[in-house]
Curated annotation (Swiss-Prot):
Active site: 35 (proton donor/acceptor), 44 (proton donor/acceptor)
Phylogenetic placement of the source organism: Viruses, Duplodnaviria, Heunggongvirae, Uroviricota, Caudoviricetes
Protein name: SAR-endolysin
Keyword Hydrolase: yes
Enzyme class: hydrolase
Keywords, comma-separated and alphabetical: Antimicrobial, Bacteriolytic enzyme, Cytolysis, Glycosidase, Host cell inner membrane, Host cell lysis by virus, Host cell membrane, Host membrane, Hydrolase, Membrane, Signal-anchor, Transmembrane, Transmembrane helix, Viral release from host cell
NADP is among the record's keywords: no
């Protein structure tokens, strides 16, 4: 993980899991995190219309140029949605750094498969390291493994494990 990202994530810990995930996604300067930024909608590697830091959905307006403030608002809304989708399934106390890493992961891949995942099962069994190691399995898009996703998952795993230290 780049030292600047490590420092920014450490500074965000007091803000909670959503703040941690936001810094992971946007990076210290707002465009150098795990997600790139595009103010103009584009199709991602699996053909989904995407804008800003990875926002997807029917509310994307093709042809519109989004502002930095609009992108921040979309990210905050999306991370709050991720939190609502997964928090009810986590039955044990986990560190905020782990929760932030999970929010980042599920912002990227969607929360659908989380409910039946080995990742969640390991969390609820109290196997924090085993759960964090599961992040390495979420590296496929469109049936293909991607180096960029492998790198991202290693960074998320590192943050996930911070609560162990």
């Amino acid at each position: 993980m780049p030292p600047s990202l490590r420092k920014a994530v450490a500074a965000a810990i007091g803000g909670g899991a959503i703040a941690i995930a936001s810094v992971l996604i946007t990076g210290p300067s707002g465009n150098d995190g795990l997600e790139g930024v595009s103010y103009i909608p584009y199709k991602d590697i699996v053909g989904v219309w995407t804008v800003c830091h990875g926002h997807t959905g029917k509310d994307i307006m093709l042809g519109k140029t989004y502002t930095k403030a609009e992108c921040k608002a979309l990210l905050n809304k999306d991370l709050a949605t991720v939190a609502r989708q997964i928090n009810p399934y986590i039955k044990v106390d986990i560190p905020e750094t782990m929760r932030g890493a999970l929010y980042s992961l599920l912002y990227n891949v969607g929360a659908g498969n989380f409910r039946t995942s080995t990742l969640l099962r390991k969390i609820n069994q109290g196997d924090i390291k085993g759960a964090c190691d599961q992040l390495r399995r979420w590296t496929y898009a469109g049936g293909k493994q991607w180096k960029g996703l492998m790198t991202r998952r290693e960074i998320e795993r590192e943050i996930c494990l911070w609560g162990q230290q």
